[in-house]
Swiss-Prot record:
Gene behind the chain: hssl33
Alphabetical list of Pfam families matching this protein: Coiled
InterPro entries: HssA/B-related
Lineage: Eukaryota, Amoebozoa, Evosea, Eumycetozoa, Dictyostelia
Protein name from the UniProt record: HssA/B-like protein 33
Family membership: Belongs to the hssA/B family.
Compositionally skewed regions (Basic residues) per UniProt: 73-88
Length: 98
């Protein structure tokens, strides 16, 4: 029962994160990428190189939404249709980018 309770509490916190993410940034609904960014970044909720949220080694893409992450000089970011492309040192430049 303890496990079930913690799963349902995590799920409700993710739902509330989704509604808050969709209310800022570029004005579009952020969907699952922003949630993965805030929950899976491993410290701080602003893309730290994990899960499609801006690669600190200058890798393939940033989320292009509210959690762009720092990224390297080659981190151009595809954006996945959720916001502006991130160029250079700062991911997408949304309200959660570091």
């Amino acid at each position: 029962m303890t496990l079930f309770s913690s799963i349902s509490s995590m799920s409700s916190s993710m739902t509330s994160s989704r509604s808050s993410f969709s209310s800022f940034g570029s004005g579009t609904s952020m969907g699952s990428n922003s949630i993965a960014c805030s929950v899976g970044s491993g410290g701080g909720g602003c893309g730290s190189g994990s899960g499609g949220c801006g690669d600190l080694t200058g890798g393939a893409k940033s989320s292009g939404g509210s959690c762009g992450g720092k990224g390297g000089p080659h981190n151009h970011g595809h954006g996945n249709g959720h916001g502006p492309h991130g160029h250079g040192g700062k991911g997408s430049g949304g309200s959660c980018s570091c």
